[in-house]
């Protein structure tokens, strides 16, 4: 038996090696769009004869045997699982004619000997304006019960990062129209921002407002990747986007965001790849010259899923049980998020810190890629100040006089100094009261309280709940307003005038209105 099998294996090996090494095969693999044949992977696989059979199923790991033409690593294989299309991604080559794959959906019901077809390309998903307002899963199938997606263009989820020559080297800030962010922790155009915050402090509302403002100010679109999040949260977000006007029900004109979900209940393969699916959709819009916002909630779940996949594939774990390829996996995702000469992808990533340990390898690896951090504080949200961004904890490498200009830098630092002084005086105020402070400190406290309130802002997406019309504030108006505050120009105005207004002119107008009402 062994002797008879040897001649069969040899041609398979000979055929597999040239197929992988042929230069002509490379462009097809890296091509950004798929041909008509590639869009019908089953037909293509049948034509090429790359049909194998299931040899072993261990949870999310499936071993598939091919007689010849072994599929390349990262190729998508397809099989029918009780009437549903099941996609497997090749992760390892075992011996001469077996591949080990990770399933993108449940393998319940899969049987040995079942036919599997090689699509000849990585997992490919639809891209284009047809994605706006829709929800897709990791393999590009709609999951919002709004009918099929009519996109005509498809892209593989594994793409190389842009070459150095394609990248834009100019440091620019992305003006969001949100005062606290633009002044104290400005976002880099094409940068990566870490969003830290507990439950109920306004992460979702801030994300919605950013999507709305980028669409208004830059005409850009947004992509939201839900990586290993709760199904309930994903469902709530979808409906909130419709209620707040960010998206139209069922997609179509007027929708500003595409949603890509791989929830907590999905197998690790889906959660490890859904971030790449979302990024592929975002890259299409960037290549069309757009400024794209790409949200990931939660980047920790991406690492966690990678760790599960690594263990399933039998790799020896690294520190704290994470995969040995942790930095490589993170880099492969993060390096694709950048500004090119065509457009930009600016990424806002919610980061869960396990056991509040910032030295844990998962968050520590993410921090290396971040340009800015936006910290949402419960103490600030309890004061009723929204967005509840902590002005002293949030940072940005863009807050540099060479990038934002000397005036912006000096005003931002003066605002932070005033708030820091107020923070250090709070213990004295709590114990002894305001009367025990010096006149200078009383003035600092009064200004700091006005600054705190002026950092609040009415949001467009919260209009339906608050009744206050949203405000999009120009950067120059923001700098002008806070400069006047720290220099004492508005010491005569009451604190209440600065709460939930846009520009300083709005605050002056509100003060006059309050004075008229009091009279």
UniProtKB/Swiss-Prot annotation:
InterPro entries for this protein: AAA+_ATPase, ATP-synt_VA_C, ATP_synth_F1_bsu, ATPase_a/bsu_AS, ATPase_alpha/beta_chains, ATPase_F1/V1/A1_a/bsu_N, ATPase_F1/V1/A1_a/bsu_N_sf, ATPase_F1/V1/A1_a/bsu_nucl-bd
Signal sequence, renumbered to the chain: none
Region (Disordered) location: 1-40
Stretches with biased composition (Low complexity): 1-26
Domain of life of the organism encoding this protein: Bacteria
Positions with a binding annotation for ATP: 197-204
Molecular function GO terms recorded: ATP binding; ATP hydrolysis activity; proton-transporting ATP synthase activity, rotational mechanism
Subunit relationships: F-type ATPases have 2 components, CF(1) - the catalytic core - and CF(0) - the membrane proton channel. CF(1) has five subunits: alpha(3), beta(3), gamma(1), delta(1), epsilon(1). CF(0) has three main subunits: a(1), b(2) and c(9-12). The alpha and beta chains form an alternating ring which encloses part of the gamma chain. CF(1) is attached to CF(0) by a central stalk formed by the gamma and epsilon chains, while a peripheral stalk is formed by the delta and b chains.
Name the record gives this protein: ATP synthase subunit beta
Gene name linked to the record: atpD
